A protein has these predicted regions:
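Short, well-structured beta-strand/strand-turn elements
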Residues: 77-80, 150-156, 501-506
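Structural preference for alpha-helix termini/caps and helix-kink/transition segments
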Residues: 283-285, 292-522
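Short low-complexity, flexible loop/linker segments enriched in glycine and/or proline
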Residues: 94-97, 252-254, 521-522
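Short, glycine/charge-rich beta-strand/loop segments that flank catalytic centers
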Residues: 82-88, 111-114, 124-139, 157-164
Length: 522
């Protein structure tokens, strides 16, 4: 009973605070939550598995993963997520013929690769995976119902088309002018805007037997309508995909689903992610343009977190520019946070001298409160993620200014409970929690040397690094005591060589600390 009341309260508050962009109205609207439902449905259009996925696909799924994480973590919504896999399509048939293999074998190969790619990108897999060929009988029944209701017609070759002129609200997502019927094309497609629900098979192509119309296979749009309806019924809370799917795919989905279920609107909130362009180009990355970068190629040069940070630094509806400059920016932002966590840990562990400044502590706690409030406001504004990252960076800078403050003196060593450790820890853990909530795995405590490693090899490596750092610290203390320039050069040289090995050394008075820099999450 308490949980039901809490959920009703929290979702009501969410509907009041969160604003989402509505592509139909061209404005932001409150989130509509059906409080009687025990879960929130979230359906994503998956790939047609005829080839390897590229980073244009990756940007869409990483961005949607970020949105789902925000809905779950920040707004405590009980999402149930689903994604389809289109494993029968003209492109699959053609590619299988080119490679002289069975079409099912080809589809399974690229489907397995797709799920593997999502895992490597730290994208949470959907709660339910819906493969088209596992639901052919349901698709046939969906098509038959639309024919019986008078919204679809059968052509002389056994194909079935949806008649767009029969649905007055066609063009709901994107304005469409329905042209007059082609009277000379009797027996076939009646209007240019009519779309295939069922495609009659040609010789040598895979097919399924369907009573009432010809043997064949599903059209593209009917697949998602059937699969989502099969799982979630006559109402979807969220339906997501790339901006290029808004028309005709999502338009046609919405149309046929409203007619099938006899509802005014099938989807409450459409979420469309912006496309990915190469730096300096104005057209999207696509296989037809032969300008794609595979996910495997991406992860050879960059970590999954670096690509995720690239996605976080722009609004999910905006175009992402991909290239060396953009990726260096994303990498640098990540590295600044990693360096901050290393500094903070060194301070808390006593490797950096403690600071004693009550005014600075109060200022930091005020900054923490301000950042919390700002992040909530940004996320409420149609999932703005770029500004929260900037706000967290500013908070991290405030912490670093405090722990590197000159207000460090042995004269305060007798004071009890007067250091800034509590405020530093509070701000540090808040920043870490936020970044982890966006799916940035390397922001966890396991990204530094302070966590217990489960690998004996890593443990040995860390002991070796500790020994090197400790020895260097002794040399450095000797250099300070004797003012020996040559010893200082040796210390600097060792620090630079460790940096090449992605180990960052930092000196704190008489002590030093280290952390892994730019460790890949692959």
């Amino acid at each position: 009973m308490f949980l039901r009341l809490f959920r009703k309260y929290s979702t009501a508050k969410l509907a009041q605070d969160l604003r989402l962009y509505d592509g139909r109205l061209k404005e932001k609207v409150p989130l509509q939550i059906h409080q009687s439902k025990p879960y929130i449905s979230f359906y994503t259009c998956g790939p047609t598995v005829y080839d390897s996925a590229h980073i244009g696909h990756a940007s869409c799924y990483v961005r949607l993963d970020i949105l789902q994480r925000i809905l779950r973590h920040h707004f405590q919504l009980p999402l149930v997520t689903a994604m389809n896999i289109t494993d029968i399509d003209d492109k699959i048939i053609v590619r299988a013929q080119e490679q002289q293999i069975n079409w099912e074998q080809l589809a399974r190969q690229y489907e397995d690769e797709f799920w593997s790619d999502l895992k490597r990108l730290n994208v949470r897999l959907p709660d339910v995976k819906l493969r088209v060929t596992d639901h052919i009988p349901a698709i046939i029944r969906f098509v038959q119902t639309l024919v019986e209701k008078g919204f679809a017609y059968t052509t002389i070759d056994g194909s079935v088309y949806f008649e767009t002129s029969k649905y007055e609200r066609y063009g709901k997502l994107q304005k469409v002018v329905i042209e007059p019927a082609n009277e000379s094309n009797k027996g076939y497609k009646r209007h240019p805007s009519d779309f295939a629900l069922w495609k009659a098979s040609k010789a040598g192509e895979p097919y399924w037997v369907a009573s009432g119309f010809g043997d064949g296979r599903p059209g593209w749009h009917i697949e998602c309508s059937t699969l989502a309806s099969h799982l979630f019924g006559n109402k979807l809370d969220f339906h997501a995909g790339g901006l290029d799917l808004r028309f005709p795919h999502h338009e046609n989905e919405e149309t046929q689903s409203c007619c099938y279920h006899n509802v005014p609107d099938w989807v409450t909130h459409w979420l469309h992610t912006g496309q990915l362009h190469h730096e300096g180009q104005t057209h999207k990355m696509s296989k037809s343009l032969k300008n794609t970068v595979s996910i495997n190629e991406l992860l050879k040069d960059y970590s999954a977190d670096e690509f995720r940070m690239l996605c976080l630094l722009s609004h999910y509806r905006n175009v992402i520019e991909y290239g060396p400059e953009a990726m260096v920016t994303a990498r640098n932002v990540l590295q600044k946070f990693k360096s901050f966590f290393s500094d903070s840990k060194a301070y808390v562990d006593g490797l950096k001298p403690a600071t004693y400044d009550a005014a600075s502590t109060d200022s930091l706690l005020a900054k923490l409160s301000e950042t919390r409030s700002s992040v909530v406001q940004f996320l409420n504004n149609d999932f703005n993620t770029a500004n929260p990252v900037l706000a967290l960076g500013e908070l991290a800078s405030s912490v670093q200014r405090l722990i590197n403050s000159p207000q460090q003196s042995a004269s305060h060593s007798s004071l009890i409970g007067s250091t800034n450790v509590g405020a530093v820890l509070a701000a540090t853990e808040y920043i870490r929690e936020e970044l982890l909530s966006y799916g940035l795995e390397s922001m966890g405590k396991q990204s530094t040397q302070y966590i217990q490693s489960t690998s004996e090899t890593e443990q040995s490596l860390e002991k070796l690094i500790e020994t090197i750092v400790s020895t260097r610290s002794e040399i450095r203390l000797q250099a300070v005591a004797t003012k020996d320039a040559q010893l200082f050069k040796v210390c600097d040289l060792l620090r630079d060589r460790m940096s090449v090995a992605n180990v960052e050394l930092k000196d704190h008075g008489k002590t030093s600390s280290w952390s892994f820099r730019g460790r890949s999450t692959k």
